[in-house]
């Protein structure tokens, strides 16, 4: 007999295996490994808890009461289901928050600039305040996400749980009480906390001003760049990890192909933005190095003059009284060498930054490096580098990253566009093959046009999706539920099915097939074997019967009507005859028609297994009322009865009047009478016993 632990593991395995349909083979390998490791750790912890606390036992339904160690995490509030709609929507929002954070962090590198007036390094105060505020807003949203992660159950809820994500109703279950410990022990909490540490803010507002006051202008750039990369690179991994986890959990991110293309373009734009910001900061460092060399060659110049008197500049004008600073600000030699665009100083790849480091336009300082990043990542070259090792390494990293990013961008967009246009291309290829075949077989123009119209109508209805094949590949229970959901409302529109119970309707929905007919299509000819029953959903059909002397009896079938009722008589007749019954009418579409088809074998199955349903008097009356054969017979019978009545009245009136030509008059009346009786006798009357034997 299976133990309690084995039963719990088996039930958990069945729940986990039911979610495989959400995953893809390429994206979920690492996530599945992580989930397996997490589940193993949880099982080990549960075994330890069982050994330590033997009081833990099963409650009703095989669920356990939570221990005191787990109850402290219940104080966080309502436990959230990771697959609930609210959590999935928040994951999408948080993905955009991560992208915003990746765009905001490089803005810290633009806060350093060179004063064109005093030729000193400073921090743009207003830009620093703006970037700090934006970073604080994204950090608050990250903190909110950490709080949500504490409340999300690390184990999926039971299938009968609440759809709103509340898995903590009716007492703590074994799967729902384990919430926060795996999130903490898997280092997810510490990693989420690391990416929101205020390292750039501390460096910008504390470290950099102190370094500027000491005159370490080149060290300032190095400290800011190292701090930025130290947190930015893990932040990129954090965003990618969240993206893949979200895709693994729900199977898609935003549900459309264009969102996938947009995410790839955003990632490429953010990469260009980060590369341009680093390029700008290294350009500031090259300018500071040039100014430092000029200061060392100038008599009376102190390195502290390379940093402004106020390290954080807010745009206020301050009177400079220091003569040494005034002399340095008026040094035209240093200005022409370091800050002039036509300088002979070897800036290398940072040549274009000369016009930016001393610019007062913040928009230009941000947009131009983004343009440089997009251009460099897209062209893989056009960089004039010096022999300095740091510049060479930077150029190598930028070019290699650009090659990888462009390759990934083109590949992903190609995949997304192929997913969008593959069906259309398959349709065009199929139409070319059909045109070639029709031309080879010399089909008439009318046939060709009918084939084209049918293919267009089928494409317009389903956009190339083979619904029958798609549903047939699903498990039997899921297939029946889906077809019952899709077809029930339409099947109930057929009056014949309105008085049947749900079991019969479920079997009918499981066997009906969706059919589309173009205008002017002959569906069935009179005298052919009836292959299926047709239930009109949209459009109109013309049902015609050929009487004697070339006379036709026609009626129109609209939504709610059906044809092929001969199959009902054939299935319920005793003894049963294997030969299919002949059709009593010809069906022609008057417009594009959508209908449900129930094949003869399916009708036979339904009538044999649910014979009691057709004994119902309401079903009998509905079948007779909506049957084209019964309607035609009833119309002819009423019409002939009326004509006989009118003929009787005519004969009665003629008995009081002397006719001028009594013989010819009587002869014509006799012919009419015989013609009427011949019509009623030769009209196809349905077998009255067909529905009495049900």
From Swiss-Prot:
Residues 631-660 form the IQ domain. It comes from the Eukaryota. The keyword Transmembrane helix applies. Residues 1-92, 148-187, 238-251, 414-694 are cytoplasmic. Residues 1-15 have a biased composition (Basic and acidic residues). InterPro entries: cNMP-bd_dom, cNMP-bd_dom_sf, Ion_trans_dom, RmlC-like_jellyroll. A nucleoside 3',5'-cyclic phosphate binds at residues 496-626. GO terms for biological process: plant-type hypersensitive response. Induction: Induced by both ethylene and methyl jasmonate treatments, or after pathogen attack. This is Cyclic nucleotide-gated ion channel 4. It comes from Arabidopsis thaliana. The lineage of its organism: Eukaryota, Viridiplantae, Streptophyta, Embryophyta, Tracheophyta. The gene is CNGC4.
């Amino acid at each position: 007999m299976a133990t309690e632990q084995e039963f719990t593991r088996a039930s958990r395995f069945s729940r986990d295996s039911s979610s495989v349909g959400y995953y893809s083979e390429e994206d979920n390998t690492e996530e599945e490994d992580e989930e397996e490791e997490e589940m193993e750790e949880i099982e080990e912890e549960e075994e330890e808890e069982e050994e330590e606390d033997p009081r833990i036992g099963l409650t009703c339904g095989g669920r356990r009461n939570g221990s005191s160690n787990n109850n402290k995490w219940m104080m966080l509030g309502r436990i959230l289901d990771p697959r609930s709609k609210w959590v999935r929507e928040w994951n999408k929002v948080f993905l955009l928050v991560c992208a915003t954070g990746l765009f905001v962090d490089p803005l810290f590198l633009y806060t350093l600039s060179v004063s064109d007036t005093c030729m000193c390094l400073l921090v743009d105060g207003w830009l620093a305040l703006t970037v700090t505020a934006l970073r604080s807003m994204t950090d608050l949203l990250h903190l909110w996400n950490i709080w949500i992660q504490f409340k999300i159950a690390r184990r999926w809820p039971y299938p009968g749980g609440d759809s709103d994500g509340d898995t903590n109703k009716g007492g703590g279950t074994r799967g729902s009480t384990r919430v926060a410990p795996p999130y903490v022990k898997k280092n997810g909490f510490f990693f989420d906390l690391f990416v929101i540490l205020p390292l750039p803010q501390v460096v910008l507002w504390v470290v950099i001003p102190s370094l500027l006051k000491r005159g370490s202008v080149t060290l300032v750039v190095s400290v800011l760049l190292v701090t930025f990369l130290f947190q930015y690179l893990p932040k990129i991994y954090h965003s990618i990890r969240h993206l893949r986890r979200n895709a693994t959990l729900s199977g898609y991110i935003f549900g459309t192909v264009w969102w996938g293309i947009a995410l790839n373009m955003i990632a490429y734009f953010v990469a260009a933005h980060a590369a341009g910001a680093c390029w700008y900061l290294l350009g500031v460092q090259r300018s500071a190095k040039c100014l430092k060399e000029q200061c060392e060659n100038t008599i009376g110049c102190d390195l502290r003059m390379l940093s402004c008197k106020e390290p954080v500049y807010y745009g206020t004008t301050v009177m400079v009284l220091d003569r040494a600073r005034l002399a340095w600000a008026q040094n035209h030699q240093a200005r022409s060498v370091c800050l002039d665009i036509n300088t002979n100083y070897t800036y290398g790849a940072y040549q274009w930054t000369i016009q930016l480091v001393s610019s007062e336009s913040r928009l230009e300082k941000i947009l131009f490096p983004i343009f440089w990043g997009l251009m460099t990542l897209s062209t893989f070259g056009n960089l004039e580098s010096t022999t300095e090792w740091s510049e060479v390494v930077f150029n190598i990293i930028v070019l290699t990253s650009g090659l990888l990013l462009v390759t990934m961008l083109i590949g992903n967009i190609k995949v997304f566009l192929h997913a969008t246009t593959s069906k259309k291309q398959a349709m065009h290829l199929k139409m070319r093959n059909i045109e070639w075949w029709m031309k080879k077989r010399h089909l008439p123009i009318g046939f060709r046009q009918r084939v084209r119209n049918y293919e267009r109508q089928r494409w317009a209805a389903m956009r190339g999706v083979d619904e029958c094949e798609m549903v047939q590949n699903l498990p039997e229970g899921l297939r029946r539920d889906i077809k019952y959901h899709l077809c029930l409302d339409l099947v109930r529109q057929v009056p014949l099915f309105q008085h049947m119970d749900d079991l019969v309707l479920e079997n009918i929905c499981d066997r009906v097939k969706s059919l589309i007919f173009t205008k002017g299509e002959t569906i069935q000819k009179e005298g052919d074997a009836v292959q299926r029953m047709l239930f009109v959903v949209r459009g109109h059909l013309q049902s015609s019967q050929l009487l004697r002397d070339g006379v036709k009896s026609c009626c129109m079938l609209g939504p709610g009507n059906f044809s092929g009722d001969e199959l009902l008589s054939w299935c319920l007749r005793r003894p049963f005859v294997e030969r299919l019954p002949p059709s009593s009418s010809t069906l022609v579409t008057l417009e594009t028609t959508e209908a449900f088809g129930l094949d003869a074998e399916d009708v036979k199955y339904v009538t044999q297994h649910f014979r009691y349903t057709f004994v119902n008097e309401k079903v009998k009356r509905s079948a007779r009322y909506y049957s084209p054969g019964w309607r035609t017979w009833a119309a002819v019978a009423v019409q002939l009865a009326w004509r006989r009545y009118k003929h009787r009245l005519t004969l009665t009136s003629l008995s009081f009047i002397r006719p001028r030509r009594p013989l010819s008059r009587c002869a014509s009346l006799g012919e009419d009478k015989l013609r009427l009786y011949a019509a009623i006798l030769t009209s196809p009357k349905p077998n009255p016993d067909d529905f009495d034997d049900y």
